[in-house]
């Protein structure tokens, strides 16, 4: 009997180990690693991805699981992956917060200096008016700030939207959000205790400050950006500042003007990337005077490395361009930009790229490099990560409804293709909201995305190795 029992336990253990080994990076672009694939008719949406220094990953998303206890809404979920793509939490992730949101807004994901996941989101658990909550989740999935996290707002007086979070180099956590017409920031210590009183409020009489992005910088500081306008229909422009570990405005009370001529496209809240030196690289596109993409590098002291209002991606005045994404090579102070190029009527489009030198000069020709020529497929939502001496660029190629794929190409510093266009995700489906990042130490990149191959949206992820192969090296 003991022998039978021992054999049974060994068999069960072997099956568990084998099944766990199956959940790893896929080498087949038609079979990407599924993180949340409940085909229950409810969507799993809006993934964010963050690499860990050890090569692992955190991925977060919203899930409106109809089987969850009422009230049913878009709840916050999290998964941790090993460097090999093995899920460390249960499949479909762990629930960070059970919410009743009927729709989603932007939110924040980052890591702290101890490798914990940090999340900031709108929280419906405290009443009718959504509040801003921050959560810290340990590598084992434990809620380190308790089941309800740290609530940063309260009451029904203020309207709060689109929070972001950043883990600072001194072990702290900064959360930013839009409150009415202002952008507000609060710093928390490792235990979740507020450090900046009632928060640092960025405001200007007669103007709205809508939070755009937030990232950690040097010496415990953060860089924050926002869209500035004075109401619907007015020009939207881009501002930024850097806050010290104690909340001091390091770039001055007048802030840094990233862009102040013309207007951002309506609804465009540009992300930026830290330069690793205390500064940041910004990319955005305008709707007036024309649909055009720009980049700017703001140095650690708040000065502009590129000309004021940024360097244009292309001097081609016939076409238009939208949706830029930037990456930065710290060793050479170069910026890589990828975007969607369109004809004047916006009936055909392609994927183009540009490299800027340290002072903003276009290095890949005055009109950029053509990765995908203008054509009838919709080439949308490009992103890129810096790798080697160049960049790895992703985009969605949509031939028609239900027939979209994720494609990629890797460019060298000289603009030549290190890897010609190759497929990353090819199952017949619609795809959206891709989020890409890279483990700098290993050069392994990953892109997470929404995908409706199961009938409703699920969350999938695919790695890309330095040699542009998929799966285990």
What are these regions (language model features)?
Residues 24-473:
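Extracellular, repeat-based ectodomains that mediate carbohydrate processing or recognition
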Residues 7-19:
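Bacterial N-terminal signal peptides
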Residues 1-6:
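Positively charged n-region of N-terminal signal peptides that target proteins for export
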